[in-house]
Regions:
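The feature marks the mature, well-folded catalytic cores of soluble enzymes
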Residues: 2-205
């Protein structure tokens, strides 16, 4: 068990041909935040282990392992392709706060890119750092000016060729205004696009 003491590298990755992975590309590992809905999560693990490695973040590894090996919700699961990692969590929604896979050169030099999460959930916001530590992959974080960027995975889709799709929420949550729990980063739309480009190789947003 390790404790994440800092966020990732807060400067752009040192590559000139960055490529953000597409939503539909083959994956090496599926990440799950074990927080509520245990029966559904167990079924996701069972359906995924024949396709890829499954990494389960949980606050109580022994309890999670016992549940995965138990008879409920489909029966015992073979854990040979499952990593159970102890990590503090706030919520289940790892799609929104998890890391983004980016390559420095097409399919090589893999890194992870992590944005500021758009919710007041500090444990969730550092899960990407825990993933990078577990896999031995560098994490680049948009958490420090002038590259501080707030975003959520549910508002992002990439095609793997330099184009990404976002709603205007990314503008609203980076306009420098205040909300009940934080003050947003302050960027123009052009500055937002520049951050996506230098961290993820996105040239069309």
């Amino acid at each position: 068990v390790s404790t994440v003491l800092s966020r990732g590298i807060e400067t752009p990755p040192p590559y000139t041909n960055l490529r953000a992975a597409a939503e539909w590309e083959e994956i090496e590992a599926l990440t799950i935040a074990w927080q509520g809905y245990p029966c559904i999560l167990k079924q996701i693990v069972a359906a995924s282990i024949s396709e890829c490695r499954v990494i389960v973040f949980t606050e109580n590894p022994s309890s999670t392992i016992n549940y995965l090996l138990g008879n409920s919700c489909g029966g015992s699961i073979d854990l040979d392709n499952v990593d159970v990692v102890e990590q503090e969590l706030n919520t289940i929604w790892i799609r929104d706060y998890g890391a983004n896979t980016v390559y420095g050169s097409w399919n090589d030099d893999r890194i992870l890119v992590d944005w500021m999460y758009n919710r007041p959930r500090p444990e969730d916001d550092v899960v990407s750092d825990a993933l990078g530590e577990h896999l031995g992959i560098d994490v680049y974080s948009t958490t420090a000016a002038p590259y501080n960027l707030m975003n959520t995975g549910g508002n992002y889709m990439s095609d793997g060729f330099g184009t990404a799709f976002e709603s205007e929420l990314v503008h609203d949550e980076n306009n420098g205004e205040s909300t009940w729990w934080t003050t947003y980063p302050n960027h123009t739309p052009t500055e937002i696009e520049d951050i996506f480009e230098v961290f993820m190789g996105i040239d069309t947003l």
